[in-house]
Amino acid sequence: MLQQFIGQSSSSLNNSINTAVILAAGRGERITGGEEYSSKPLIKLYNLSLIERSIKKLSDKLNVNKIYVITGFKHDKLKIHLDKLKKKLTVDLEIIFAKEWEKGNGASFLSVLNHIKQKQFYLLMVDHIFNDEFYSTISKSKINNTKCYLAISKSLSSMHDYNDATKIKITENKITNIGKSINEMDGFDAGFFVLHSETFNNIKNLSEKKFLSLSDVMQELIQEQKLYFIEVTGGSWLDIDTKKDFSNAKDFLLNF
């Protein structure tokens, strides 16, 4: 019913968006064990690195042809891998190093907004994986081409960690709160956004904070009543933060 509301209040299908941003700047210490030589985006699931899997899915399922990859930790190592993918894939990949990546993924995102030439784009984290059902829902959703959306699920699968999941609160058709410690919640952040660059014109000063998560950035949109949602199912997405999550991800991909 929530998803139906989105369709009724929107103006165009999602097939006009051809650009995506992948956040791949963090350390990923919980899954790498803090090993300094490890790079989370390069971790392989069934012979595909997390970053290559994200790129291929965006291209194959959403017809994305321009992808900005935001790097930070182990930038040089990741760049070597991405340069190889440039020769192998038909997608136009642009690698952007976020100088302030250690301040959080929110700071990394805000620092590269000026590089993104397209007004509306997808945003996702490299450690989130999605099945075909998820991408189908996104591609069929009707959206307003001037608004921002977050994919949310009203429930979680058994593979998710409830305590670690980011919760959201909804009032009518807008997200009114986001965070991991929300008591009265209506759903869960699936880690996939449809964003409009001009929406962030008034909040770029947030990057002056010592630490800034992506949820902090989205909280600013929420305060301005500018964050809407697209509903997906709880079993259509998974975030990979720990070694247990990595094991679950193998089962998740087998059950596509």
Please name every model-derived segment.
Residues 37-53:
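Short catalytic helix/loop segments, enriched in acidic residues and glycine
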Residues 48-64, 80:
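A short, N-terminal amphipathic alpha-helix
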Residues 77-121:
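Short phosphate-binding loop-to-helix
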Residues 119-129:
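Short beta-strand-to-loop acidic/aromatic patch adjacent to the donor-nucleotide binding site
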Residues 131-208:
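Conserved core of the sugar-phosphate nucleotidyltransferase
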Residues 206-216:
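Donor nucleotide-sugar recognition loop
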Residues 219-232:
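Catalytic donor-sugar/metal-binding loop of nucleotide-sugar-dependent glycosyltransferases
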